[in-house]
C-alpha cells in the first residue's frame, strides 16, 4: 500500500516543543501538549499526530474528554488500524505467552497488557479456554469489533467474556459493559492451576477480570518463608497467598478481607487442594481496624502478607496514599515477632519502588523496629513493561526482615 492510498485521518497538531515524548515513543499525548485538532474525530476514532510543523509522529485514538487526549496505536506510518493490525499485535503477544505457559505449566495468564503490548487501554486475561476482555480507553472501545474479530482468528477455540465494568471508563465518557461476547458463559467458579495449586476464579463477579494473575510469582515465593510459621494474610481476596502458605507448610494462616464472598471462595480453595482446614482461619473485617485490635491484644505473627488494593488513582491522592501505606505497614511491623518477615506490596502505578521503599523505612522508624530489605518483587512475566512506558511497572513489593 502506498502512502497516497492510506485512509486520511484527522490530524492532532501538537504545540511547539511538545513532541519530545512521542519521539521517545511514549504512547500518551496529554491535553497540555495539544494545539488543535484538524478535521472532525469522534470519541475513540483514529487520528494522526503531527508536530507543530505538520511532521507525522504517530497514529492513535482520540479522546477529547480525557487528560490523555490521544493514545498511540502505532509509530509506523504504514500501519492502518484494522483487523489485520490487531491480529499482528495479538500474534506478537501470543508468542511470548505460549512460551511462558509451556515453560511454567500455566493454563491462565495475561495475554494483553495494554500499552506494553502495543494495545493501549486493552487488557485480556486468559483463564483456561476463556478470554476475559477489559476495554479501558475510548480507542479500545471504538475498535471493539476489530479486536474481537482478531481474537477469534487467533483463539478460535476460546470463549470471550467482557468485563469492561470498571469506573475508569466513565472518565472517557463510556458506559460500563459486562457479559458474554462469544461462546458459552463462564461457570460461577472456574478452576485454574498455578504452581501446583488449584484455584477457583469468579470471572463474572470477581475483582478485575476475576483473579490477580500479576501476583503469581510472589505467591510462589511466599512458600520459602512460611514453614512452621504463623501467617497473617491481609486483603486476602480468594486466598491465593493462603493456599500457597499452607502448601509451604505454615503452622497457621489467618486470612482477612472485607468480602465474605471472597473469604468463602478462599475456604473452598483450601478444601479443593486437600489442605488442612484447621490451620486456616478466615476473618471478615477491615484490615486497618483489625491490625490495631491485634496490637492492643498483643497478637503476634511470624509472617505478614500485605497486599492492599490500589490506594492512589491520581497525583492529587498520592500524599494521602503514602500515609495509608505507612500506617498499615507500621502496624504490620509492630505485630511481627523478632526475625519475622513482612511481604508488602503496592499496586499503585504512581507509587515508585523507591518511594515505596522509603515509606516502609519510615514505617519501621515509627514502629521502633529495624528492618532489612531482603528481596524485591514485581508483576509476573506475563505482565511485561515496555521500555518506553515505565508506567507499566505498577506492581512492586519487598520482603522485609523485621528485627
Curated annotation (Swiss-Prot):
Disulfide bonds: none annotated. Keywords: Cytoplasm, Methyltransferase, RNA-binding, rRNA processing, S-adenosyl-L-methionine, Transferase. It catalyses: cytidine(1962) in 23S rRNA + S-adenosyl-L-methionine = 5-methylcytidine(1962) in 23S rRNA + S-adenosyl-L-homocysteine + H(+). InterPro entries: PUA, PUA-like_sf, PUA_sf, RLMI, RlmI-like_PUA, SAM-dep_methyl-trfase, SAM-dependent_MTases_sf. Pfam families: Methyltrans_SAM (PF10672), PUA_3 (PF17785). It is an enzyme of class 2 (transferase). The keyword Membrane does not apply. Its EC number is 2.1.1.191. Residues 9-88 form the PUA domain. One of its GO terms (molecular function) is rRNA (cytosine) methyltransferase activity. NCBIfam families: PRK15128.1 (NF011707). Belongs to the methyltransferase superfamily. RlmI family. This is Ribosomal RNA large subunit methyltransferase I. It comes from Salmonella typhi. The lineage of its organism: Bacteria, Pseudomonadati, Pseudomonadota, Gammaproteobacteria, Enterobacterales. The gene is rlmI.
